């Protein structure tokens, strides 16, 4: 049985061109082993408190590429993303808030983690704008939407110059999703959209 104060975190490697990494908390507690770009860990139960996070290249614990202190409140559900381009790596926290969800609906939001992309709009093929003028490191509010299969395009705000086309996004009922834009508009790895199920869909705190 979990402590009533338990929090839950997952890690996301969203730093373009960075190698696979190992992530440690408070010295020797490993949170992620050989986490590659674009990958998430499962949600991990952790106690609230202050943590020192060290990120190393996978299988090389000589010198961390990032050391950061992280304060985690109790009963939090969150994704902790490694973002930015080396050597300006940083940790970015995306909390999964508990909020009402009407039966047989889904909720989606957009998280802009592409370091060289301008502010963007997320658009449906019919021209309907789901999210508008979202800048790097912005997290939108959740939007209620009918469960279905969707196609979206991402374009610099105010233009129809699509930089990413994503078909066949299947949204199930009674669930929360985040659309994470990662990668680079100019260069490799190119811009892509990660669409995980958020922990607030099924984790009780």
Where are these regions (language model features)?
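Intrinsically disordered, low-complexity polar regions and short flexible loop motifs
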Residues: 1-205
């Amino acid at each position: 049985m979990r402590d009533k104060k338990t929090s839950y975190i997952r890690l996301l490697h969203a730093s373009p061109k960075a190698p696979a990494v190992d992530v440690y908390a408070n010295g020797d507690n490993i949170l992620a082993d050989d986490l590659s770009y674009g990958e998430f860990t499962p949600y991990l139960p952790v106690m609230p408190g202050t943590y020192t996070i060290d990120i190393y290249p996978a299988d090389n614990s000589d010198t961390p590429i990032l050391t950061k202190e992280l304060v985690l409140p109790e009963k939090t559900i969150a994704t902790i993303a490694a973002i930015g381009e080396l050597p300006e790596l940083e940790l970015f926290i995306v909390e999964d808030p508990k909020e009402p969800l009407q039966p047989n609906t889904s909720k989606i939001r957009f998280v802009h983690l592409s370091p060289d992309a301008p502010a963007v709009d997320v658009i449906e093929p019919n021209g309907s704008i789901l999210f508008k003028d979202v800048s790097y490191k912005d997290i939108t509010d959740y939007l209620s939407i009918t469960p279905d299969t969707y196609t979206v395009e991402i374009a610099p705000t105010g233009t129809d110059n699509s930089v990413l086309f994503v078909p066949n996004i299947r949204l199930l009922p009674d669930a929360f999703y985040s659309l994470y834009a990662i990668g680079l508009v100019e260069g490799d790895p190119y811009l892509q959209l990660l669409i995980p199920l958020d922990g607030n869909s099924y984790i009780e705190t």
